[in-house]
């Protein structure tokens, strides 16, 4: 019996050395949690999405002209507004000069008239073509109109602000209430008027008023009232600044 016990003890020792003690499920779960925490701590960062350039989107928004910028020579609406103001002054001065002297624009400049259009001076033809293209926006009318902000202080006229406020007009700013968009439209009309009056005078030898059978060569006080009103309208529209502004692709306030 003692011999059997002594033989069993080495067997137990051998079996104890041969097999490693198994860890409990709680210990295995803790090891897994530690492993997960380490992985989360060294997780690679996700790449940030590239920033979208919003300026390219704005370019398509501000091009609201007839031909856009791609079909022109880079004119902005502010440039076209300046050309329109010059055209309004020129058209008003030419009508006033013809009404007083009885001569058209070209006759006042001693240029040959009453000839076919292809025999006209090349520089004159270039000027007519430039004026026509500018009137329809083919030179490039990049930009869009943004009106001034309107609020309660603009809608209600405060009492006791002066003579203009008593008449229902704004104390500051232009008298007509024109915006730059309206002024641009009137400038285009003046450009068209100059171009077609020049074409008619080249062919017929008559000025713009003579083509309409309006009496010319008279003193200023005898000019037709409607004609005088048109002359004054173009003159004041050219020198009267309009409200609002033009915004271009570069987000510059014009």
Curated annotation (Swiss-Prot):
One of its GO terms (biological process) is photosynthesis. It is a multi-pass membrane protein. One of its GO terms (cellular component) is chloroplast thylakoid membrane. The chain crosses the membrane at residues 86-106, 120-140, 184-204, 219-239. SUPFAM superfamilies: Chlorophyll a-b binding protein. Sequence repeats lie at residues 42-148, 149-253. It holds the Pfam family Chloroa_b-bind. Its main location: plastid. InterPro entries: Chloroa_b-bind. Residues 1-38 form a transit peptide. Keywords: Chloroplast, Membrane, Photosynthesis, Photosystem II, Plastid, Repeat, Thylakoid, Transit peptide, Transmembrane, Transmembrane helix. It is found in: Plastid, Chloroplast thylakoid membrane. Involved in high light-mediated energy-dependent nonphotochemical quenching (NPQ, qE) and thermal dissipation (TD) thus regulating energy conversion in photosystem II and protecting from photoinhibition. Also seems to regulate quantum yield of electron transport in fluctuating light conditions. Belongs to the ELIP/psbS family. This is Photosystem II 22 kDa protein 2, chloroplastic.
